[in-house]
C-alpha cells in the first residue's frame, strides 16, 4: 500500500523511496560499519500513512541512534550488548539534513545547506538577531571572505547529542523557534565578534578563532556560545559578590543577582560578614534572624528570574565555618527540620581555614562566633584575615577571640561539625568546600585584596570586594544620584582546551589564541552591572580551563589509577601553565599589562618561586613577565564544561566518565550514549567515576593545582557502601594535597544539578 506523507507546506504526496534512500546514503557516507539498507528497512517498519516529513525524519534519526547499542548473539546463544559509535554520526547527519531544510525555508532560499553568508548577516542584523557591528565594522568584501572560509564539512564532526544540544540551545532562532543559523555560522559569528578588537587584523583572527572552535579543539563558555554576536552580548559565565552587614548591601546584591541571572549568568555570594541569629541590632539584643532569611531571599530571586523560562537562576552562598549560623546553614538543602529555614535552590559552600582542619584532625574543639560581635568587641573583622606559610594572622586572631571573655563563642567538637558536613554532602551533594587559607596564600594579587569565596562551580579564585552606599543626593531637577563605595565584583570569562581533540604539539599555538580570545571577551563584553565592568578592567581576569581530560588519558593509553597518570598530569599542566603565562605576557607587550600588575606576585616573581619553577625556561619567563608585565591578573581555572563538552563529543572538565555507556530517556525517547571513541581497546582504559579509587583523583588534582593560579571544579564520587571514615579521609587528603576547592560530593544514588552558565 502506498504511504501518503504530509509535506511542510501542508499538501500530501506519496512517500518517495528514492528520496529516503538518498538521505540515508548521505548520512552513512564514509561510515563503513553502518549499513544504509539496514537503517532503511528498520525505519520503514515504523512509517505510517499521514506522517509528516518531520516525523519521517525523526523516525530515521531515532532508528539510527537506537543502533548505537544493540543486542547481538555472541555465537553461543547469549544476547550481549554490541556498540557501534558510528550510528551516532549517522543520526547527527540525518538531523543536520533537517536543519539544512529548515534553514532554507526560514532564510527563503532554495539551496541545500549553507547559503550566502553576507545575505544572512544583513538579514539577521535587520531582524535584530545580530548586532549592528557585523555590518558597521566589517565591509561587504570581508563578510564575503569570511563566508567563503566557512567549512560546512566540519558539521560532520558532531555526534547526534552534540549537534542536537547546539541546535536546541545556541543557534540563533526566531520567536517561534525557527532556525536562522547553522552550526558553522554560529562559530563564525562568535569568531567575528571576538576578533572585533583586533582592528586591521580582525579577519585574520576571526579565521583563526573559527578554526579552533569549528574543529572542536576548544569550547567556549555557555554565555559566549549563546550571546556572542547578538544585540545584548553578555559573554561572562559567573560572578561573585560580597555582602556587607547592612540592609542596603543585602538588597543591592539581590538586585545584582537578578540582573546577572536575567542574562544567563550565575552568582557566588559571600555572606560571612552578616550577623548571626539572635545577634543584636542597634543594641537591641536577640533581634537578628541570622543569615537564613537573606539566603531565602536570594533563593526566591533564583526561582523568579528564570532566564526566559529556560532554567532557574544559579547561586552559591558561602559562609565561614566559624559563623554561629553554621549548623542551620549546612542543612540548607536537606529535608530535615523546619522548611521555613531552608533554601532548596541555593547551593551552600563552607569556607574552611587551616585551624579547623588541624583541630578536627587532633579531635579538638572549635569555637563558633558572631562576626558582628567580633567587630564590636575587637574592632576588626576576623574574616578579613588569612594564614600563609610564613604568617598565621588568621589563626592568631582566632585564638585571641577564643580567649576574650567578652565574646560569647560556642565551643563544639570539630569532628561533630565535620560529620554534619558529610551527612549533608551524602544527602544533597553539598556544601561545597572552599579552603580559604590555601586559596589566599596562593593568590597572586593579594596586594590588592582578598579572596572570600568562589563562584557557583568553584573554579574561580579572585579578589572579592564589598559595595556600600556612600550617599544619596536629591538633585534640583528631581532626580536622585546614588553614590557608592565600590568593591570588586568578580567576573568569570571562561573557555577550555579540548584535550581529547588536540595533540601536545598544538598546545602552545592554541593556548595563545584562546588567551587572546578571552582577553577580547573582556574588551567587548556588555557587563550586567557596572561593578563587574570595573573589576574586569582592573584585573582583566580570565579562566583558561580544560575539557576532555579523561578522553586525553585514554587517547594516550593511560589508566586513571596509575602513577603514569600523576606524572602525565604534572607535565601536561605545567606546559599549559607555561604557555598560558607566556601568551599573556606577549599580549602585555602588545596591549599593556593589567592595571593592578604593580606589586603583584607576577611582578615580584614570587608566583614562580612559590611553585618551584626553577628551570631555564621558567626563569626566562619570570624575567620577561617582570619586564613586560602580564595582560591578565588571573589566568587559569578549570570549569566543569558539562554541556559544552557534549557538543565537542569529549569528556567533561577534569572528571572521569560517569558511565561507559548508558541509555538516557527524555520525553519518551531513548538515546544511547557512550564514552568518546569507545571501542574494544578504549573500553578497558575507561574506568567509571564511582568505581575509581578517589585517592587517585585527589593526587592528580593536587598535582594539577600547583600549576593553576585559580582552582578546579573538582568532584568526589562516593557510593552508598562507603563508610564515614572513608569519606572523611577524602576531605582530609584533599586538604593535605593543597586542593583549593571541592565541588560536588557525587553520591551514586543522587542526581546533581549542573551549572549551565559555567560550562565552557
Regions found by a protein language model. Name each.
Residues 34-188, 204-210:
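Core nucleic-acid recognition elements
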Residues 212, 254, 510-533, 541, ...:
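Internal maturation/activation junctions in enzymes
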Residues 178-248, 394-424, 428-433, 573-623:
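Gly/Pro-rich turn-and-neighbor structural signature
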Residues 98-137, 145-153, 236-486, 490-496, ...:
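Active-site cavity-forming subdomains of large catalytic enzyme subunits
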Residues 51, 56, 66, 157-173, ...:
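Core structural elements
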Residues 75-124, 164, 439-470, 542, ...:
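Terminal amphipathic helices with adjacent charged low-complexity linkers/tails
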Residues 149-169, 197-230, 258, 691-702:
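Conserved oxyanion/phosphate-binding beta-strand-loop segments in alpha/beta enzyme cores
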Residues 132-134, 139-151, 155-165, 456-463, ...:
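Catalytic alpha/beta core of large soluble enzyme barrels
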Amino acid at each position: 500500500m502506498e504511504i501518503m506523507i504530509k509535506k511542510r507546506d501542508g499538501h500530501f504526496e506519496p512517500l518517495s523511496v528514492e528520496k529516503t534512500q538518498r538521505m540515508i546514503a548521505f548520512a552513512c557516507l564514509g561510515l563503513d560499519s553502518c549499513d544504509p539498507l539496514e537503517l532503511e528497512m528498520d525505519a520503514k517498519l515504523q512509517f505510517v500513512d499521514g506522517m509528516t516529513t518531520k516525523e519521517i525524519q525523526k523516525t530515521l534519526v531515532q532508528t539510527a541512534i537506537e543502533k548505537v547499542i544493540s543486542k547481538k548473539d555472541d555465537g553461543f546463544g547469549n544476547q550481549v550488548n554490541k556498540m557501534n559509535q558510528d550510528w551516532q554520526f549517522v543520526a547527527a547527519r540525518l538531523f543536520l539534513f533537517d536543519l539544512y531544510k529548515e534553514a532554507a525555508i526560514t532564510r527563503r532560499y532554495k539551496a541545500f545547506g549553507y547559503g550566502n553568508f553576507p545575505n544572512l548577516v544583513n538579514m539577521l542584523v535587520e531582524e535584530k538577531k545580530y548586532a549592528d557591528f557585523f555590518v558597521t565594522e566589517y565591509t561587504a568584501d570581508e563578510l564575503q571572505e569570511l563566508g567563503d572560509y566557512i567549512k560546512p564539512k566540519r558539521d560532520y564532526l558532531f555526534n547526534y547529542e552534540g549537534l542536537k544540544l547546539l541546535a536546541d540551545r545556541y543557534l540563533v532562532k526566531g520567536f517561534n523557534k525557527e532556525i536562522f543559523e547553522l552550526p558553522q555560522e554560529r562559530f563564525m559569528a562568535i569568531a567575528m565578534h571576538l576578533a572585533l578588537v583586533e582592528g586591521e587584523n580582525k579577519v585574520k583572527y576571526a579565521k583563526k578563532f573559527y578554526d579552533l572552535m569549528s574543529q572542536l579543539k576548544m569550547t567556549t563558555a555557555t554565555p559566549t556560545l549563546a550571546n556572542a554576536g547578538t544585540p545584548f552580548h553578555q559573554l561572562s559565565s559567573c560572578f561573585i559578590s560580597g555582602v556587607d552587614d547592612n540592609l542596603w548591601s543585602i538588597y543591592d546584591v539581590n538586585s545584582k543577582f537578578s540582573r546577572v541571572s536575567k542574562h544567563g549568568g550565575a552568582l557566588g555570594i559571600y555572606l560571612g560578614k552578616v550577623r548571626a541569629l539572635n545577634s543584636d541590632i542597634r543594641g537591641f539584643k536577640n533581634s537578628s534572624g541570622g543569615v537564613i532569611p537573606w539566603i531565602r531571599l536570594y533563593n526566591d530571586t533564583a526561582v523568579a528570574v528564570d532566564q526566559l523560562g529556560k532554567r532557574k537562576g544559579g547561586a552559591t552562598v558561602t559562609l565561614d565555618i566559624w559563623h554561629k549560623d553554621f549548623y542551620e546553614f549546612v542543612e540548607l538543602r536537606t529535608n530535615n527540620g523546619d522548611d521555613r529555614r531552608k533554601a532548596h535552590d541555593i547551593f551552600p559552600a563552607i569556607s574552611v581555614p587551616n585551624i579547623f582542619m588541624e583541630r578536627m584532625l587532633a579531635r579538638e574543639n572549635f569555637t563558633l562566633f558572631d562576626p558582628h560581635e567580633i567587630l564590636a568587641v575587637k574592632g576588626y573583622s576576623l574574616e578579613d584575615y588569612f594564614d600563609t606559610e610564613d604568617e598565621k594572622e588568621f589563626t592568631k586572631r582566632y585564638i585571641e577571640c577564643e580567649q576574650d571573655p567578652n565574646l560569647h563563642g560556642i565551643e563544639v567538637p570539630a569532628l561533630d561539625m565535620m560529620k554534619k558536613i558529610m551527612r549533608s554532602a551524602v544527602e544533597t551533594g553539598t556544601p561545597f568546600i572552599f579552603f580559604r587559607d590555601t586559596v589566599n596564600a596562593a593568590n597572586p594579587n593579594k596586594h590588592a585584596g582578598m579572596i572570600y569565596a568562589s563562584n557557583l562551580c568553584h573554579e574561580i579564585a579572585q579578589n572579592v570586594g564589598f559595595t556600600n552606599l556612600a550617599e544619596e543626593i536629591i538633585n534640583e531637577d528631581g532626580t536622585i544620584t546614588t553614590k557608592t563605595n565600590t568593591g570588586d565584583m568578580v567576573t568569570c570569562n571562561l573557555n577550555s582546551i579540548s584535550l581529547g581533540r588536540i595533540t601536545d604539539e598544538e598546545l602552545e599555538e592554541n593556548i595563545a589564541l584562546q588567551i587572546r580570545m578571552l582577553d577580547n571577551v573582556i574588551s567587548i563584553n556588555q557587563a550586567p552591572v557596572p561593578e563587574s565592568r570595573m573589576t574586569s578592567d582592573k584585573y582583566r581576569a580570565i579562566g583558561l580551563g580544560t575539557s576532555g581530560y579523561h578522553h586525553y588519558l585514554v587517547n594516550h593509553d593511560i589508566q586513571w589509577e596509575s602513577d603514569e597518570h600523576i606524572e602525565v598530569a604534572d607535565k601536561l599542566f605545567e606546559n599549559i601553565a607555561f604557555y598560558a603565562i607566556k601568551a599573556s605576557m606577549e599580549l602585555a607587550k602588545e596591549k599593556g599589562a593589567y592595571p593592578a600588575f604593580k606589586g603583584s606576585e607576577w611582578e615580584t616573581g614570587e608566583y614562580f618561586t612559590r611553585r618551584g619553577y626553577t628551570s631555564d625556561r621558567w626563569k626566562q619567563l619570570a624575567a620577561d613577565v617582570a619586564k613586560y608585565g602580564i595582560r591578565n591578573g588571573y589566568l587559569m581555572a578549570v570549569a566543569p564544561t558539562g554541556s559544552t563538552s557534549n557538543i565537542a563529543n569529549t569528556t567533561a572538565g577534569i572528571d572521569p566518565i560517569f558511565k561507559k555507556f548508558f541509555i538516557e530517556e527524555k520525553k519518551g525517547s531513548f538515546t544511547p550514549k557512550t564514552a568518546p571513541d569507545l571501542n574494544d581497546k578504549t573500553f578497558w582504559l575507561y574506568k567509571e567515576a564511582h568505581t575509581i579509587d578517589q585517592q587517585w583523583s585527589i593526587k592528580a588534582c593536587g598535582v594539577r593545582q600547583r600549576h593553576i593560579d585559580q582552582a578546579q571544579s573538582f568532584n568526589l564520587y562516593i557510593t552508598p557502601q562507603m563508610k564515614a571514615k572513608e569519606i572523611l579521609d577524602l576531605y582530609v587528603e584533599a586538604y593535605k594535597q593543597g586542593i583549593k576547592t571541592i565541588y560536588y560530593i557525587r553520591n551514586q544514588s543522587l542526581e546533581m544539578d549542573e551549572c549551565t552558565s559555567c560550562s565552557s
